[in-house]
Amino acid sequence: MRIPRTLLALRLFVPGALVTVLALVGCTQSPAEHDDRLTKAAGLARVSILCPKDLWEETKPTGGINEVKATVSKVSTGPRADRGLVRVSMTGTNLVAYLKELDSNAHPSSWNGEKKNTAASRRVYDAIAPEIDRIKAATSPEDPAPEIVIDDTIPEQG
C-alpha cells in the first residue's frame, strides 16, 4: 500500500514542527555572560545574600530541577537589623542552581511570557550578576565569603 505524498509530508512535518515549538518554549533569553557567571559561581565555597525575606520567598526554587539547599537566618543584629532582611547562605554549586532558576524566571522566552515572579527574579538576578562578575580570588584564608546585599532602602556605596 502506498501512502500519498501529501500525507507522508504531513506525517513528517507535524512532529518536526512540534519539536521545534517545544524547544523554543523551553528557551530563555539569558544575558550573554550567563554561562560565564555559572562557571565562576560554581567555584565559590560559600556566598551570602542579604535580602528582604519576601524577596527570597518569592524567588527561591520550589522543587523541580533547580533545587537549592541554603541556610536562611533573620538578620537581627547590626545596622541592618529590624529591616525584614534574611541572610541566605549557600555553596557555589547551589548558587548555580539558584541563578538558573532566576534566569528562567527573569528572562523568559517571548513564547512563555512573564511569570508571576518575573520582576522579583529579575531584581535578584540583576543584583547578583555584577557581584559575581566582581568577585576575585581570595588572597588569604581569612578573606570573608562574598556577601551580596539586596535592599533598595540602603544607598549604594561606590
Feature-to-residue mapping (PLM):
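Positively charged, low-complexity terminal tracts
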Residues: 2-158
